[in-house]
């Protein structure tokens, strides 16, 4: 529905209106392309939603009557306003130009507008099309999501605007390169922990700055012990065993020795836990403290463990995590042993 499409004049004016404007309703001869005669309206007028649109019609002194219409609805006839919409105002009515303005334009104002004139010969009309552009707007987007590693996810971003906006998805990550999807829907099969983070939806149509919204994707996975560090400490000194684990949600840590759990508050020993790191601290190491300790990291998706050794000076340490092991010892003795055997023979 165009400007004033639902408004009516008082009944007292109806008959007079019909008689005065009978010749103006577009039954006149349309002005053909390239016709140099009047009236001559503007080319298509393009404005943004909320702006004002000016419709101009070039005429000359042969015109006896003139009017602007929106489809079959009369907006102005001469200096008389036939539309009750306060947004429509007369700008000029001279011997050379007849112009109106539509203020605070909205999408329902879009459509054809006709400049109709009466001369001594016959009515003529000229038409202009009003195009209303609308800034992009994201009307629907997925909520933040938490999902287990290996599952599939689908993200949605619906945007409106005129012209229809282009929607793109991008993974906000140092490892992500460019756009991951140029569509309203982003689907990820078998998601990995590296694909967690923020996903940015952008809607653009060159009418205004792109509109951007973000969705946070949290990928849950079981603990993985990335570092388990043993240490050699003399008796009477302070020693620390460290166990670092990556997990979402964050891992909970427990320490064991000889299948017995070490609890907080044991004399001379302190367990210090952080979201991804646990420390077993000995304030005054004794001979009894030496040996293998087991760090267990767990969350709701699983658990893992690593064996860590507290040893004295010159002893060999072993740290095992799954199938991997690391040994540190007196490897400098090996070349001397080989040299001794060669000299013997």
UniProtKB/Swiss-Prot annotation:
Gene name linked to the record: NTM
PROSITE patterns recorded: IG_LIKE
Name of the protein in its database record: Neurotrimin
Cleaved signal peptide residues: 1-30
Membrane disposition: Lipid-anchor; GPI-anchor
Function: Neural cell adhesion molecule.
InterPro entries: Ig-like_dom, Ig-like_dom_sf, Ig-like_fold, Ig_I-set, Ig_sub, Ig_sub2, IgLON_domain
Coarse class of the protein's main subcellular location: membrane
Disulfide feature: 57-115, 157-201, 243-295
Alphabetical list of SMART domains matching this protein: IG, IGc2
Keyword vocabulary terms for this entry: Cell adhesion, Cell membrane, Disulfide bond, Glycoprotein, GPI-anchor, Immunoglobulin domain, Lipoprotein, Membrane, Repeat, Signal
Positions of glycan attachment: 44, 70, 152, 284, 292, 305, 321
Keyword Isomerase (UniProt): no
Domain Ig-like C2-type: start-end pairs: 39-126, 136-218, 222-309
Organism expressing this protein natively: Bos taurus (Bovine)
């Amino acid at each position: 529905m165009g400007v004033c499409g639902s408004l009516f004049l008082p009944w007292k004016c109806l008959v007079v209106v019909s008689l005065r404007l009978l010749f103006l309703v577009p039954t006149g001869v349309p002005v053909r392309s390239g016709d140099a005669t009047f009236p001559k309206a503007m080319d298509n007028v393009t404005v943004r939603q909320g702006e004002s649109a000016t419709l101009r019609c070039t005429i000359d002194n042969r015109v006896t009557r003139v009017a602007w219409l929106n489809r079959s609805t009369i907006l102005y006839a001469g200096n008389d306003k036939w539309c009750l919409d306060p947004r429509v105002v007369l700008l000029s009515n001279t011997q050379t130009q007849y112009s109106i303005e539509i203020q605070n334009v909205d999408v329902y104002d879009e459509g054809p507008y006709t400049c109709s004139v009466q001369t001594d010969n016959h009515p003529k009309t000229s038409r202009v099309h009003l195009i209303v552009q609308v800034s992009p707007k994201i009307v629907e987007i997925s909520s933040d999501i938490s999902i287990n590693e290996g599952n599939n996810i689908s993200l949605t971003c619906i945007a409106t605007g005129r012209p229809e906006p282009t929607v793109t998805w991008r993974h906000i990550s140092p490892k992500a390169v460019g756009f991951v999807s140029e569509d309203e829907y982003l689907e990820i099969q078998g998601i990995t922990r590296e694909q967690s983070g923020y996903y940015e939806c952008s809607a653009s149509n060159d009418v205004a700055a792109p509109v951007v919204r973000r969705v946070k994707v949290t990928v849950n996975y079981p603990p993985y012990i990335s570092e388990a560090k043993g240490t050699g400490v003399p008796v009477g000194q302070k020693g620390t065993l460290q166990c670092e684990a990556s997990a979402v949600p964050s891992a909970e840590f427990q320490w064991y020795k000889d299948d017995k759990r070490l609890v907080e508050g044991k004399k001379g020993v302190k367990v210090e836990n952080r979201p991804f790191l646990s420390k077993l601290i000995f304030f005054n190491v004794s001979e009894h403290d030496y040996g293998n300790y087991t760090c267990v990291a767990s969350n709701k998706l699983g658990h893992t463990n690593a064996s860590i050794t507290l040893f004295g000076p010159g002893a060999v340490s072993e740290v095992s995590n799954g199938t991997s092991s690391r040994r540190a010892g007196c490897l400098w003795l090996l070349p001397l042993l080989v040299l001794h055997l060669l000299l013997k023979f």
